[in-house]
């Protein structure tokens, strides 16, 4: 089978300035008899050396599509102009007649579109079987954001969400509902929300493939004398509210001496300086790593990952990485959404920060029990978020 892929992002083994890892790992898992030609706008700005490396690793041909001059011009000089548009600015991107002719004349068996905003490009190729990987429903993201009190408190964030929400709604209402196009998302609620917006659409939830797994696999046995706890990811909008609440609880906990005795905390990512300083001042052993050259190697040095995500859609890649590599993940509902794990069987889910503290108190006394949860989590991810399995499901849509 020959597939032509058109993508806003250049695939990469890890997310580089965008969601570039998902298409990479779907391509890694494909049947090797499937020939893929990729046309990419390379909005995540990979270098020529990186692009050549990706082409070799994935055994695909890659052609760069020039980003339209008007897109660059408006983003650079007239960014506020976007407020007046009915749709997100990237949704106005279309293939030129020569680009379209090249793809049509190549006569692929199917077209694979990556990036929600490329729906007009998809429509230009409406005579082909198509799969459109979104991978998230952006209108759901803004809908959720507008329902959060912390978003309303920040005027810039609130008005951005208020302006972007109807733009994505307008775009998604216009999605093609023909029988020869399937939409692929990595969130169950994303699919449900999209089906409400656009009745009749063929939208499907496929689990997000996990990324890298350390070799040899990490031995799941909590460190002694102190258990190593990791906070991974930048301190940003997605973690801000719940991370602040959790740090406050750690500092003000009546069990402070017990928590200090049994744990060492590491923050991996930028923006955590204030939290590290506050925990150190409270007597906790705390470390800060702003960047790890080998991310998987670094996370495997730890036993537990706490993920206090308070907003978002789809699947969180760093949570998948942690569980797949044998860490016990303690996270919020948003952190664990769409991941094939269950509370107290293969992960720990908490609602309020004080619940997380309760589990941290219990873990040192029942190490074996919580190690078994981490073991079950890894087993579930490796089986149900398997690259090959999910890639087979995706490419099957291209034959229907």
Provide a role label for each language-model segment.
Residues 1-61, 106, 251-257:
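N-terminal subdomain of nucleotide-sugar transferases
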Residues 22, 208-280, 288-295, 300:
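Conserved catalytic-core segment of nucleotide-activated headgroup transferases in glycan assembly
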Residues 49, 120-122, 166-202, 394:
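A short, active-site helix/loop in glycosyltransferases that binds the activated sugar's phosphate group
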Residues 97-102, 138, 150-183:
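Membrane-proximal helix-turn-helix segments that form the acceptor-binding/catalytic region
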Residues 300-314, 325-327:
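Acidic donor-binding loop of glycosyltransferase active sites
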Residues 318-321, 328-332:
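Short hydrophobic beta-strand element within catalytic cores of glycosyltransferases
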Residues 347-354, 362-367:
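Conserved acidic donor-binding segment of nucleotide-sugar-dependent glycosyltransferases
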Residues 365-398:
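A charged, aromatic-enriched C-terminal amphipathic alpha-helix characteristic of glycosyltransferases
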């Amino acid at each position: 089978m020959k597939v032509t892929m058109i993508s806003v992002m250049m695939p990469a083994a890890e997310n580089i300035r965008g969601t570039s890892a998902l298409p990479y790992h779907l391509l890694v898992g494909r049947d090797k008899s499937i020939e893929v030609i990729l046309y990419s706008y390379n909005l995540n700005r990979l270098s020529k050396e990186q692009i050549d490396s990706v082409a070799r690793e994935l055994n695909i041909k890659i052609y760069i599509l020039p980003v339209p001059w008007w897109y660059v011009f408006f983003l650079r000089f007239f960014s506020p102009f976007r407020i007046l548009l009915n749709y997100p600015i990237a949704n106005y991107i279309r293939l030129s007649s020569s680009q379209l002719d090249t793809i049509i004349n190549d006569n692929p068996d199917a077209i694979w579109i990556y990036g929600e905003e490329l729906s007009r490009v998809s429509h230009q190729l409406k005579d082909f079987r198509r799969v459109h990987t979104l991978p998230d429903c952006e209108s759901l993201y803004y809908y959720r954001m507008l329902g959060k009190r912390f978003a309303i408190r920040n005027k810039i964030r609130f008005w951005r969400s208020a302006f972007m929400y109807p733009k994505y709604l307008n775009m998604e209402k216009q999605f093609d509902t023909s029988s020869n196009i399937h939409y692929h998302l990595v969130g169950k609620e994303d699919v449900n929300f999209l089906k409400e917006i656009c009745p009749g659409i063929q939208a499907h939830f496929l689990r997000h493939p996990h990324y890298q797994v350390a070799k040899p696999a990490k031995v799941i046995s909590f460190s002694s004398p102190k258990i190593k706890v990791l906070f991974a990811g930048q301190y940003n909008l997605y973690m801000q509210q719940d991370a602040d609440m959790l740090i406050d609880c750690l500092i003000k906990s009546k069990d402070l001496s017990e928590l200090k005795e049994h744990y060492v905390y590491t923050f991996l990512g930028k923006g955590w300086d204030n939290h590290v300083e506050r925990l150190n001042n409270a007597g906790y052993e705390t470390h800060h790593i702003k960047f790890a050259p080998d991310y998987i190697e670094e996370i495997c040095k730890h036993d537990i990952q706490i993920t206090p995500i308070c907003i978002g859609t789809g699947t969180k890649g760093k949570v998948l990485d942690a569980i797949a590599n044998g860490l016990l993940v303690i996270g919020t509902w948003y952190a664990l959404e769409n991941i094939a794990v269950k509370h107290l069987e293969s992960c720990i889910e908490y609602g309020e920060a004080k619940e997380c503290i309760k589990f941290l108190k219990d873990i040192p006394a029942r190490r074996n029990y919580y190690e078994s949860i981490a073991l079950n989590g890894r087993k579930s991810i490796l089986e149900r978020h398997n690259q090959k399995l999910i890639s087979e499901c995706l490419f099957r849509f291209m034959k229907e």
